[in-house]
Amino acid sequence: MVKQGKIIVLEGLDGCGKSTQLTRLCENLKARGQKVHLTAEPTDYETGRYLRRILSDSLHKNMYLQSALFLADRLEHITHPEFGIRRFLSEGTTVLCDRYYYSSFAYQGTASDIDWVMDINLKCREMLTPDLCIFLDVNPDTCKNRIDQVRERPELYEKDAALMQRIRNNFLQVLDKLKDRQNIVIIDANLGPDEVEKEILKYV
C-alpha cells in the first residue's frame, strides 16, 4: 500500500523569497529520494487565469467575488482528476504549494470580512488541511523594495508598503488563530536565502 503524501505550503508577502525557497526545498526533497510535485495558487486552470488578470489590476476588485473565485480555483486544484492535489497525495507524492487558503484570508481579508473568508474555506467539505504551513516573515518595506527592482508595474496588492503591512498583520492574525489546530511555523525571512533555507529544513 502506497503511503499517503504530504502537503507543505509556503506563505508570505510578495517579494518574501517563496519561489527561491520552494525551488531549494524541492531539490532537497528529491535528493532524499522523495517524489515531489511543485504547484501554486492561483493555478493555471481557467479560474486561476481569470484571477491572475484581476491581480494584474486589469479587472474589477470586488473582494467577495475574489474570495469565491479563489475558493473555486482551490477546489479544482484539489480535486482535478489528472492534476489535482488529491491524486498526487494518493501516489505518495509530497506536494509543495506556493500559497494556499492562508493567502485568501490575508489578502482578500483586507477589504472583506476575514472571518467569512476563513469560514467558506475551512468549512468546505473538499478542503485539505496542509501537513505543514511555513510563513516567511519579511519586513513589508523590504518586500516592496524587492518588487520595485524586478517589476515595472506592481500587481494589485503590491502598490504600497502600508497595504502590504495590513496583509502581513492579517497573516499573523489568522496564523495565530490556527496555530493550535494546524502545524504552522513562522520563519524570519529577513535573513539571507541560505539561512532561511536552513531554518526551513529544521521542520521538513
What is the predicted role of each segment?
Residues 10:
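Hydrophobic anchor at the beta1->P-loop junction of P-loop NTPases
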Residues 2, 26, 141-204:
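NTP-dependent small-molecule kinase module
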Residues 21:
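Hydrophobic positions on the alpha1 helix immediately C-terminal to the Walker A/P-loop
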Residues 18:
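Conserved lysine of the Walker
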Residues 13:
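P-loop (Walker A) phosphate-binding loop of NTP-binding proteins
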Residues 3-7:
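Pre-Walker A (Motif I) flank of P-loop NTPase domains
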Residues 104-169:
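A glycine- and Lys/Arg-enriched "phosphate-lid" helix/loop adjacent to the NTP-binding pocket
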Residues 32-119, 124-125:
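ATP-dependent small-molecule kinase phosphotransfer cores
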